[in-house]
Amino acid sequence: RYWFCWCFHFYYTSLVYILSKASIINALLIVNLYFIAVYISLTIYILLIIISFINIFYIMIVLPVNIFIRKQVIFMTINDLKDKVISGGLITIDDALFLSEADLDDLCKAADEIQHTFFGNDFDICAVVNVKGGKCSENCVYCSQSTCAKIPVKAHAMISPELLLRHARLRNLHDIRHYCLVSSGKRVSDKDIDKICSGIKAICRDTKLSVCTSFGLLGEDQFRKLKEAGVVRIHNNLETSRRYFPYLCTSHTYDEKIATIIAAKKAGLEVCSGGIFGVGETMKDRIDMAFTLRDLDVTSVPINLLNPIKGTPMGDFAPLTKEEILRITALYRFILPKQYIRLAAGRNYLPDSGFSCFKSGANATITGNMLTVKGISMDEDIRTIKEMGYKVI
């Protein structure tokens, strides 16, 4: 309003001054220009008034309504996506990004319902044994056995078949199903595979354990040899998304890992593949990896949590919070409804040892000690899991 009055006053005084010095023809022209200027100013003034009313209407009515509707949509969308998954559908990346910001309690409750729909009360437990450790050729920045770690890790060659069988018999005394043999290095040599195969055959003969192996980037022929010895599943983590992988490791590639998984499936083996979380990745990286795993149709998905170890490049990283871990677990259950979501390394630093994850979509775990760090007691794990209503398969 003040702007319009100022313009009108300026035009009027200018007009009076010019007319006092102009001819009649020029005066008529100036008067016309004057009214045109007044018309333009009046139009702008009216437009400003309209815009002001629109802003007031948006702030007082539209914005509060949008906020209310969004809250309703969020609640309904979690349930809609849950129903979609339970009915056999698959969520999209956009759906997953939406869920990554949804209410955590509602998300975990829905994930638990999805898990029980597809698996009932079945729970899978795995134990690991380090059959060859130390002197790893790879430069994974999170690992204490890596070439870039400044930690004295005792190295040992491939253990004998006899010692392997003794370890397996001890594990067989517990109520566990899978027994995973893990080796350091980029890949196990053909000589070591021949050596370990005799031990695998003995385990299959003398125990009820299902043998898994984590022997690195093997080829289809090597996987077939392991399958003939009795191996049912191989482990090969993608670790993170394709985008972020070069920040974690440069001594081998993401494509090599995917090729290994494809080769194992061609050999008739199940695949256990997941990643490590809390290494600087974004939520989008976590989601991208989950969708890659879904495309690869893996059987089991380990969720490893970075346990910062002094002497590694990530030794000063802050561990993920319990809430972040619950969100990852629940989100993975939505994306991977028919896979075992396996809480793995890093459980020991959680206040409840990660048991709350077993009510948020996870239905499998690795128990006992890990490769280079202490884990959760097998007896404690099995007892608590059964008390939660699960049946260990």
Segments (PLM) and residue ranges:
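Tryptophan (W) side chains
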Residues: W3-W6
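Flexible, acidic/Gly-rich N-terminal and inter-domain linker regions that tether
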Residues: Y17, I50-E138
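Short, electropositive alpha-helical surface patch
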Residues: I193-K201, A229-H235, M283-T299, S353-T367
